[in-house]
């Protein structure tokens, strides 16, 4: 059976991921006019720039949908976001600033929950608005087929008939008006934005050029912290975790994770926390550039890793970072539910996150400028009395340290012999002054 359909399957049910924007509105209306039977599915992901979710399915029905459903994905989205924090599933960082994989997390939830809803309605053909150059076309493909093995894919933006008739936003707008819908294009921005309640992605258009900075972006989850005219007073915030799960902000306990994330967004957003500018590698290994917002994720991540470093030993922390980066890449590629990802998630949540209990107090200032004011946990292995510089009882003595250093002579001797072995083969040069072979200065060799 052909998985990807290049032309409209006339007379068949097609589920379309319907946002209510111009692209999906025109596509839905066009498919109905050409003889398909479109079903519209809208994901409520808590998008900060969406004002009225209930109106979206109504518009879909007006444009010819056989049926239209609004699927509440917020609870599942926040659950996956917390899991990503517990696992450190983030692989794109620049200068210490992290992209929290908020779009890949949203696609994992949307791609599974919408296709599951379609399956309930007997709809086995799925269309969405992703383009062939991006990551989402592969993410949705993978998640869709994982959820429904019988699924076929039809994307209007891969159909030459659709492209020939409605190849641009102007043509789509004219098409809607000609069909009796007073649909006016929204004001064109200098970039494109995609968002969910975990974060926002700004990319494309002017942001494709690296001489266009964050300063052209109008944040939808935070503030323009780079604008000195924007007043941002410092603020203290306390975050509490229990067994790896964020449960309280500023002493207020949340039984609803969605409400907790919304409050974390509000707190971090007041300062512009979590904004970053990243050059990343798409799934097809071409580089792209995005500017990201994730105020709540950033706040929780900072507090989580502060507790992590005070609770776990060095080797565990090293494995957390290594496996977290690996898991983040799998998430980015649309493999969040693949077996290799589940294996990494299980080990990180079971052996790392389960011990993360405690409170962290921070002072937030402008952007990603903050200070950690206090860290409290019953599980801390940080014990200041062990290494105090003050006189008093100690867990080990000077003689103990002499013995420990003496044992180091074994590997120091081995290392010295290797250095001289490298010098004999020409990999290192001998040093008359230090007595230790050294890497040659390439400048002296004219290289």
From Swiss-Prot:
L-aspartate binds at residues 131, 135-136. Keywords: Amino-acid biosynthesis, Arginine biosynthesis, ATP-binding, Cytoplasm, Ligase, Nucleotide-binding. Gene3D superfamilies: 1.10.287.400, Argininosuccinate synthetase, chain A, domain 2, HUPs. It catalyses: L-citrulline + L-aspartate + ATP = 2-(N(omega)-L-arginino)succinate + AMP + diphosphate + H(+). Homotetramer. HAMAP family: Arg_succ_synth_type2 (MF_00581). This is Argininosuccinate synthase. It comes from Shigella sonnei (strain Ss046).
